[in-house]
Amino acid sequence: MNRTAWKSAEELSLLLGEAGRVSVFSCGICANLSGTGGARGMRNLSRLLKKWGKEVVCKECLIACCPLEIMRQAVEKNGKALRQSDALVVISCAAGVKSAFLARPGVPVVPAVDSVGSVPVATYEDDPVSRSRCTNCGRCVLAFTGGICPVNECPAGMKYGPCPRFEEEEGDLCALDPSRECIWKEVERRGDLAKLGRLKELHSRKGLERLPLPPRRNTPRPVRKVAGWLTVHAGWFARFIPLID
């Protein structure tokens, strides 16, 4: 899932500016599992906005914010409220925020959270596999790092192998930051550094082509509208999603 984190109160206040009446759309999946979105996040943000003297015109928890058709349906469904609003606050990752812009709600779109990386839906926060967030580098190495993202976890940002001081250091402490363990020691235990080196050579080749995508089927507009309507009106299911974590 795409992990999100709340923006600071100062930044959110700056983004809202002079908007006195706002509508709030909240994502029921990724942001919900991050603890920022869903019905609970929507209520928490609404309380804060009211504390700031803002009037919350409408609140809508969508099953997901990133699909454009769902966002379009939500904008259409809440058209009257949006026309009475000065801004649309979106509790979603960047994909949902972009969908809101594309849906043209007629008011400024204000993201309430920041996208901070891709993580598994898991409660094992003490494990580096779930702790290391994807940086969307475009060339994933998880297959040979035991599921740990070294770009995120290594202070030196090393991707295909440890820093030159790796062999010099005794014990498991990081050469750059002795207050933490060297993540490459853990990668060495769980992964395969030799194959990681071969992957580096492969990734460095110019003209390396990705597998082609299958031909995109054009879903008929009426089918998209029905699917969008169903998902917009199924937002109440979002209250159950945090229970899987």
Feature map (PLM): residue ranges:
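Iron-sulfur (Fe-S) cluster-binding modules
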Residues: 1-63, 75-88, 102-118, 122-140, ...
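N-terminal glycine-rich "phosphate-gripper" loop used for MgATP/nucleotide binding
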Residues: 90-94
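Ligand-binding beta-strand-loop-alpha-helix segment within the catalytic cores
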Residues: 63-71
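Short, well-ordered alpha-helical microsegments
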Residues: 96-99
